[in-house]
Regions:
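Conserved helix-turn-beta segment immediately C-terminal to the redox Cys motif
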Residues: 72-73, 88-111, 128, 176, ...
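Thiol-based oxidoreductase modules, predominantly thioredoxin-like and allied folds used
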Residues: 104-118, 134-142
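Thiol-/selenol-based redox modules, centered on thioredoxin-like
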Residues: 37, 159-187
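Short active-site neighborhood of thiol/selenol oxidoreductases, capturing the structured segment around
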Residues: 64-87, 106-107
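Short, internal strand/loop/helix patches
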Residues: 122-160
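Loop/turn elements at helix/coil->beta-strand transitions in domains of secreted/extracellular proteins
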Residues: 71-74, 102-105, 133-135, 162-165
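N-terminal targeting signals for export/organelle localization
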Residues: 1-51, 187
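A short beta-strand-turn-helix
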Residues: 45-48, 53-74, 98
Length: 187
């Protein structure tokens, strides 16, 4: 009698396992067919692609658009105040920003109040306390620019040529020497 019960439970378990795996397979196929439709709405961020335009408020309250820099090369850094590698790279970026003849503009973007970042009210005081200067900071308060540039890790830096095309994408901080060399090769 025990053998019949064990056999019945085994058959039932096998049946349930097969039924569940077919449901997952169907669900997986549905996701695969709907995924390209979702991806079609997201502009691909890659070297050679047009850099997505944005309009953000600077730390000093001015409206800044990337398109305002058309015809100029742009160093665009996405970072956060809580990010160790970001903070470690800031002194070198300040050196670069202090150079008047560098041949490109520097913009940095944070997302105040999102994902642990300081708020718009807290950030300027913290920035000053760190001794940071000469680095324009733009506020992406809704995270739309981070999303448009598909930022998944910080720091992430983009070197944009004078035609508004992405020339280099750097995950992690780029050295001043590498940034200057990359900009020198553009155009």
């Amino acid at each position: 009698m025990k053998k019949i019960i064990y056999f019945g439970l085994s058959v039932l378990s096998l049946f349930l396992l097969i039924a569940c795996s077919k449901g997952e397979e169907k669900s997986s196929q549905e996701n695969q067919t709907s995924q390209p439709q979702q991806q079609a709405t997201v502009k691909q961020i890659a070297v050679g692609a047009e850099a997505p335009d944005f309009t953000l408020q600077s730390m000093d309250g001015k409206e800044v658009k990337l398109s305002d820099f058309k015809g100029k090369k742009v160093y665009l850094k996405f970072w956060a105040s809580w990010c160790g590698p970001c903070k470690k790279s800031m002194p070198e970026l300040m050196e670069l920003a202090a150079k008047e003849d560098r041949g490109f503009e520097i913009l940095s973007v944070i997302a105040p109040g999102l994902q642990g970042e300081k708020t718009v009210d807290q950030f300027p005081k913290w920035f000053e306390e760190q001794g940071y200067k000469d680095i324009p900071v733009l506020y992406d308060t809704k995270g739309n620019t981070f999303q448009a540039y598909q930022i998944r890790s910080i720091p992430t830096e983009f070197l944009i040529d004078s035609n508004g095309k992405i020339a280099k994408i750097q995950l992690g901080a780029i050295s001043n020497a590498d940034a200057e060399a990359a900009f020198a090769q553009m155009d």
